[in-house]
């Protein structure tokens, strides 16, 4: 893994978050480099700029290195993106006084003159981001979006035209392109939340745009809901909660328990919180945390059950370090005798990790693709 970022005369040392993770993945990609080269070669001056979907701060660090007082408005839905950018600014001795942070639900500033974006994997979320920009960008504003060349097609350019303005793609460089979109100045209404029901559990679900499995139960959650453990649990963590469906069902099954919902996505945590209220569950027993796994879970919380449907993607990258951190955090925070109850694809071989960490692992249920595993501290 290389950590030396060297583009257009800008030298940085960049790490993924956390820096201690063992990974051959680097903290930026060629699309980041292409965006920076495009700005520098075009002689871009330091105007109020939005940076959106900057995974670990490569773009904000590069512009801060180029011009320390460049006014940057950084939007992210991922807690690890914020923490990664903070880590890399400190590591490179860059001030963060020129940065203002936004989630994807916060109101954007009205003085933006330039936008730099990375194309996210979730195109529904991307359309939502374009609609947000349409509400604040005046006609003629420039939006530059870096992406893999293979991800850019006529349909994607039509998404730009529908939600923000006309767009065209650059020539390919290192298998990436930069899309230039010019705002047409016409505000678009933001999409309504997606809502759906799970009648067999009497649950009503709503999702914001960057939440996994937007309008139905994913297969892993389905098998998990059918195989939750029996017991008199008092403190439960829904780790990587998404829309919160596992924790909501847990609240029905274990009515005396406090349920803690944790996700890296701010939209996921907001969706889980809304679903808790919409399903008329008691406000005092639902707790919601936008966090990197259980890193900042309050010290007094000692779960006796952790429910987990681990992701194996971080943005475009396929990685198992998130699952590994979830399992490590569960072992660290569970009370003695507490249970980690997970679902995963068979091919991911999570049983090996759990056996290594907990010295025990039981198969609770399985089908052709998924397996439910349980380990006890």
Curated annotation (Swiss-Prot):
Its EC number is 2.1.1.174. This is Ribosomal RNA large subunit methyltransferase G. It is an enzyme of class 2 (transferase). The lineage of its organism: Bacteria, Pseudomonadati, Pseudomonadota, Gammaproteobacteria, Alteromonadales. InterPro entries: DNA_methylase_N6_adenine_CS, rRNA_m2G-MeTrfase_RlmG, RsmC/RlmG, SAM-dependent_MTases_sf, Small_mtfrase_dom. CDD domains: AdoMet_MTases. It holds the Pfam family MTS. Specifically methylates the guanine in position 1835 (m2G1835) of 23S rRNA. It is found in: Cytoplasm. It comes from the Bacteria. It comes from Shewanella sp. (strain MR-7). It catalyses: guanosine(1835) in 23S rRNA + S-adenosyl-L-methionine = N(2)-methylguanosine(1835) in 23S rRNA + S-adenosyl-L-homocysteine + H(+). One of its GO terms (cellular component) is cytoplasm.
